[in-house]
Amino acid sequence: MRKVIIVSSSSPDKKALAPAAPERLWPLPEKAAIFDFDGTVSDTAYLWEEVDRAFLAKRAIPYTVDFPRQLSALGFAEGARYTVERYHLDEDPDDIVEEWMRMSRALYITKAVLRPGVTEYLEALQRAHIPYALATTNTPDLLESMHRIDIQKWFPVKVYGQEVARSKAFPDIYEEAAKRLGVAPSDCIVFEDLAEALLSAHRAGCTTCAVCSGDALQDTNEVRRIADIYLEDWRDIPLGTD
């Protein structure tokens, strides 16, 4: 789903910025990889902004950038409850979830694509027999509706936020992904684009790579302070020959 930025007291503010080191990502020393979807392997921020603006305009509520910043790691249900409370809406959160799903599905079906360089990296992992998984707060219904991304082909192993007890503010989803891949979290590298998720992946014991999302929700310096590695563009990874 969407993205959230939460300033955490555990954020390593004094840590040096993670190096932009695409060469560290191939050959991959870790036994497995875990990928976020929205903002990391797919640029969907503009789709959610379109949904948010239309949703708020329908209720005569001005759009502000802090609204999407509070939603995505919450997941759909918790995000809908937050929206009802924030704007004092006399609406059922379940109805809001259905509205978001309907609006976003129409956009994801035709507009969502993988970032340039992602498929080449996934193919390299497959050829090298390195297992990997998708770990996302998005929903199966939404991702499986996409016409331009074959989610099952590219991500046969998937963990959805609704399958674990807590949001990406906690390490649950990364621990579950590692379990499904048959490795320890410490043997995984996690690719994420926002601070809260990177912190949680660290807490799970994973190596982390912050991916440049190119959207206003990302604080580049913050994610580089948290992550072990920084990736500006998937096409920068020097795959060469396997």
Model feature map: region roles:
Residues 133-134, 210:
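Hydrophobic beta-strand core positions in alpha/beta domains
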Residues 62, 131, 207:
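Residue-level detector of anion-binding/catalytic polar loops
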